[in-house]
Amino acid sequence: GFGCPGDAYQCSEHCRALGGGRTGGYCAGPWYLGHPTCTCSF
């Protein structure tokens, strides 16, 4: 979701918009699904 899989930039922007000290995000989850989960990083 939120750009994943395939658009890590959109995921990162989504995480930054959430605030709370989040610096961005990356696509995570099962590799065979193309990393479908947007995971925020702090």
From Swiss-Prot:
InterPro entries in the record, alphabetically? Defensin_invertebrate/fungal (IPR001542), Scorpion_toxin-like_sf (IPR036574)
Q: Where is this site: Interaction site with membranes lipids?
A: 6
Coiled-coil blocks:
none
Main subcellular location:
secreted
Any idea which positions bind beta-D-GlcNAc-(1->4)-Mur2Ac(oyl-L-Ala-gamma-D-Glu-L-Lys-D-Ala-D-Ala)-di-trans,octa-cis-undecaprenyl diphosphate? 2-4, 14, 38
Select a single GO molecular function from the record's annotations and give it: lipid binding
The record's note on activity versus temperature states:
Has the lowest denaturation temperature of 56.5 degrees Celsius at pH 7. Binding to DPC micelles does not affect the thermal stability in alpkaline pH. Has the lowest denaturation temperature of 71.7 degrees Celsius at pH 2. Binding to DPC micelles strongly increases the thermal stability in acidic pH.
Keywords of this entry: Antibiotic, Antimicrobial, Defensin, Disulfide bond, Immunity, Innate immunity, Lipid-binding, Membrane, Secreted, Target cell membrane, Target membrane
Q: Name one GO cellular component term.
A: protein-lipid complex
Q: Which Pfam families does the record cross-reference, listed alphabetically?
A: Defensin_2 (PF01097)
* Domain of life from the UniProt record: Eukaryota
The places in or outside the cell where this protein is found are: Secreted; Target cell membrane
The record's misc note reads: The Cys-4-Pro-5 bond is in cis conformation, whereas Gly-29-Pro-30 and His-35-Pro-36 bonds are in trans conformations.
Protein name per Swiss-Prot or TrEMBL: Fungal defensin eurocin
